[in-house]
Amino acid sequence: MALSQGLLTFRDVAIEFSQEEWKCLDPAQRTLYRDVMLENYRNLVSLDISSKCMMNTLSSTGQGNTEVIHTGTLQRQASYHIGAFCSQEIEKDIHDFVFQWQEDETNDHEAPMTEIKKLTSSTDRYDQRHAGNKPIKGQLESRFHLHLRRHRRIHTGEKPYKCEECEKVFSCKSHLEIHRIIHTGEKPYKCKVCDKAFKHDSHLAKHTRIHRGDKHYTCNECGKVFDQKATLACHHRSHTGEKPYKCNECGKTFSQTSHLVYHHRLHTGEKPYKCNECGKTFARNSVLVIHKAVHTAEKPYKCNECGKVFKQRATLAGHRRVHTGEKPYRCEECDKVFSRKSHLERHRRIHTGEKPYKCKVCDKAFRSDSRLAEHQRVHTGERPYTCNECGKVFSTKAYLACHQKLHTGEKLYECEECDKVYIRKSHLERHRRIHTGEKPHKCGDCGKAFNSPSHLIRHQRIHTGQKSYKCHQCGKVFSLRSLLAEHQKIPFGDNCFKCNEYSKPSSIN
């Protein structure tokens, strides 16, 4: 839409409302009208000359809603009022004047001299309109009404644009186009400094601040600096504990909108991020990125101390604390400190008694998912850890580590009372109770106390009647693994029968 010499007036692009029409607009729509008109004015002034002419300033006169456009070039102004609206407008005969831009012959990039000349004739504008160009006023008026329609959807909730992949709906076409990038994986915005690519221009803009070193916003509490005001606002909530974003489904609150969005997907089951290799879907893009490392075997994060590599930056950060000894996470109940937040959360369950991970076979509950996974191997018989020395297999990595000490002769834990040594610290602690007589594990049903938790668990099955160990030959179940082992030593088959009364296999001599 380049027009040489800019033979165009402000009234050509003005959108005028009658008094009745103006009264129908709410304050937000009036503000939108003003913003669009000012943008149109900038576009008009800069036609065909790029940045050589810009509007100098827009300022409030302090008198009601009056706004004044200062250009430094337009001489005569007059006010007109439409209802509550008052705007300084270029006098109605401004169409007799026009900007005439004259290029500086010596430097093509300098701002040119400007003059206000008489409009040559109205025929020029007529010829321009009939030369195949759409009138600029019509284009800008259409643009204003487009903005207005889009704004009204905020109030009506209308979302006419639908994603074909996941059927999510949007109020703006541009928002749909941005969303589609999630499915395509396209990253069209590239950093000119380091070639890193981004899905959104806003993410690129944020990234470029890293190269510029911009950090303008400082936290008054801890002195930490941020390159974005919004990031500082989120950070402030870590000090105040504020969680203003609430889930309508379960009432859980969050400090950031993004965390609420991720949480909502637990209720909806939405997983918009798809792996192109195996088709697996994820609720978070960050989890997809981590998953992709499974296919590539890529481990880009390396520890400078020991050279160990990791798939995730967070895992590397946790690993570094092994070298530094840093334990920033403290339990409020007992003041015990931990190097990882997940370890603290798991520890807290000791105080709360919470056991959120439940076995589907026997309904036994555990404090951590890793303990549940280990327990489930009791039912499946899986033993994935093999000793390289003797080929013996184990259900947990810890059992294998203890077993391997038998081959190395390593016995680290020694009793000061009787000089007995153990390959596990827990075994030594349990042994010490023989000398001290301590029995810290008490039955809640009968009050009987035991020196080890395993003995208490075994005892509690007397009260509950729980029998977790099943014989795969005859189907009989036992409360103790040792009883199952004894039972399995009895030959079963031709030399054995099953008593219908007691369901006890008996051998026949």
UniProtKB/Swiss-Prot annotation:
Primary localisation category: nucleus
Keyword terms, alphabetized: Chromosomal rearrangement, DNA-binding, Metal-binding, Nucleus, Proto-oncogene, Repeat, Transcription, Transcription regulation, Zinc, Zinc-finger
Keyword Repeat appears in the UniProt entry: yes
GO biological process: one example: regulation of transcription by RNA polymerase II
Gene3D superfamilies associated with the record: 6.10.140.140, Classic Zinc Finger
Intracellular or extracellular location(s): Nucleus
Zn-finger segments (C2H2-type): 161-183, 189-211, 217-239, 245-267, 273-295, 301-323, 329-351, 357-379, 385-407, 413-435, 441-463, 469-491
UniProt tissue specificity: Expressed at high levels in placenta, pancreas, kidney and heart, and at lower levels in liver, skeletal muscle and brain.
InterPro entries recorded: Ikaros_C2H2-ZF (IPR050589), KRAB (IPR001909), KRAB_dom_sf (IPR036051), Znf_C2H2_sf (IPR036236), Znf_C2H2_type (IPR013087)
GO cellular component, one term: nucleus
Gene Ontology molecular function terms on file: DNA-binding transcription factor activity, RNA polymerase II-specific; RNA polymerase II cis-regulatory region sequence-specific DNA binding; zinc ion binding
Record domain KRAB: where: 8-80
Protein task: May be involved in transcriptional regulation.
Family to which the UniProt record says this protein belongs: Belongs to the krueppel C2H2-type zinc-finger protein family.
Family annotation (PANTHER family): ZINC FINGER PROTEIN (PTHR24404), ZINC FINGER PROTEIN 501 (PTHR24404:SF100)
Disease: A chromosomal aberration involving ZNF320 is found in a form of glioblastoma. Translocation t(10;19)(q26;q13.3) with BRWD2/WDR11.
Protein name, entry field: Zinc finger protein 320
Gene name of this polypeptide: ZNF320
